[in-house]
């Protein structure tokens, strides 16, 4: 079953390019079908990842944490006890195809 993860970030002033480069240069992660980085505002971004399954996503967590550690210095704390990321993930329950 297809799964997705979404992670919200806020980048420190002047660190946008380093943040984006870290994602452009990220190694291939098994089970990750597709990912996009979306600019949601001034220095704010979300990454959306499409996965083969929740099992593949869970197995990739060590790689995702290693990737995060490579650009953690570019991120601001989001506040409210979240730290530098606000992640959610889950299985697809409705799929729409308007192509």
Describe these PLM feature segments.
Residues 1-4, 8-10, 33-46, 70-99:
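Glycine-rich beta-strand-turn "strand-cap" elements at beta-sheet edges
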Residues 7, 19, 23, 35, ...:
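Hydrophobic pocket/interface hotspot
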Residues 11-34, 67-73:
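Short amphipathic alpha-helical segments
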Residues 14, 42, 55:
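Short alpha-helical
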Residues 17, 54-63:
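Short amphipathic alpha-helices within nucleic acid-binding modules
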Residues 50:
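Sensory beta-strand/linker motifs that couple input domains to effectors
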């Amino acid at each position: 079953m297809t799964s997705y993860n979404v992670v919200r970030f806020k980048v420190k002033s002047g660190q946008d390019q380093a943040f984006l480069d870290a994602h452009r240069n990220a190694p291939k992660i098994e089970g990750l079908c597709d990912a996009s980085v979306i600019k949601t505002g001034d220095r704010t971004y979300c990454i959306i990842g499409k996965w083969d399954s929740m099992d593949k996503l869970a197995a990739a967590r060590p790689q995702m944490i290693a990737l995060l550690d490579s650009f953690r210095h570019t991120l601001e704390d989001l506040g409210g006890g979240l730290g530098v990321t606000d992640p959610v993930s889950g299985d697809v329950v409705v799929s729409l195809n308007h192509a």
